[in-house]
């Protein structure tokens, strides 16, 4: 057939890679998409950079992590004595059917602006209650019917993300097809006697808060799932190279450096991290007799032996014998931030096969 032009080959290569990533088309995210700090922390953890976050538990059975911001048409719920409540709805329809969700967390940041009403040396606490809405409020019943999912006691000075397990609700919506009416997040303010006080806590965007600071602190729903391909996300143990002193032929089969730069293929607008990675490749001769370090099979040894007396039979080939995964943080077609483990992306060892 006719030779393909380089740009056609590149387009075909891009389509194959997108298919490998489970994407139907190349994502084209807007310039103002914000990557939640939690997702960056999770990526750093799984890329082997140590962190002091308890992120390991939820991700240990998952190979895909997705984050969702709530739909910002916030429904105010009537404030009762000493309580602040908000409804948060997260649209989860972009989770693929083949993905099995194993757990879900609701991340809330009751940040510094929340606590300005309190004296710095006082010992006030808030209780944060997370409810699933079973039936939304109606004209006749002003309050929604809810079910408590999680509750936690938070000191008013604690400026950190609070994570609540909302797995039962998300599984009901996704796996069992129940209607998703969202969550109610209720903050109960407790004074020194642990009775409810009327101090106000903000869990939604303030009137004058700029887009950038709000986007860093807005609530986040994080789902952990597995698409049935490859291994779960986990901290990658750095392999210790086995340095045995052995005589190697200069041209014998071995691993060579190969760095894949996502900038070169113009993908750095939707791949958040890493900017590229060391894929390596295998190249070199498989000479007769095959040395032990060439990591050969019995079949390769027999084939090489036959080749030494009959050159019509090809030599064994230098190929990857061990491959490892990489973690990638990227924006999908719906501008959702996804962390995923991709199998067989890095050559760890080569041999004659």
From Swiss-Prot:
UniProt xrefs under PANTHER family: BONE MORPHOGENETIC PROTEIN 2, TGF-BETA FAMILY
Subcellular location: Secreted
Keywords on record: Chondrogenesis, Cleavage on pair of basic residues, Cytokine, Developmental protein, Differentiation, Disulfide bond, Glycoprotein, Growth factor, Osteogenesis, Secreted
Propeptide feature: residues: 1-239
Cellular component, GO annotation: extracellular space
Region spans: Disordered: 228-248
Protein name: Bone morphogenetic protein 2
InterPro entries: BMP2_TGF_beta-like, Cystine-knot_cytokine, TGF-b_C, TGF-b_propeptide, TGF-beta-rel, TGFb_CS
Biased composition range(s): Basic residues: 231-248
GO BP terms in the entry: cardiac epithelial to mesenchymal transition; cartilage development; ossification; positive regulation of epithelial to mesenchymal transition
Protein family per UniProt: Belongs to the TGF-beta family.
Disulfide bonds: 253-318, 282-350, 286-352
Glycosylation site list: 91, 121, 157, 295
Task performed by this protein: Negatively regulates the structure and function of the limb apical ectodermal ridge.
Main location: secreted
Subunit structure: Homodimer; disulfide-linked.
Coiled-coil region: none
Keyword Glycoprotein: yes
Molecular function as annotated in GO: cytokine activity; growth factor activity
Top-level lineage group: Eukaryota
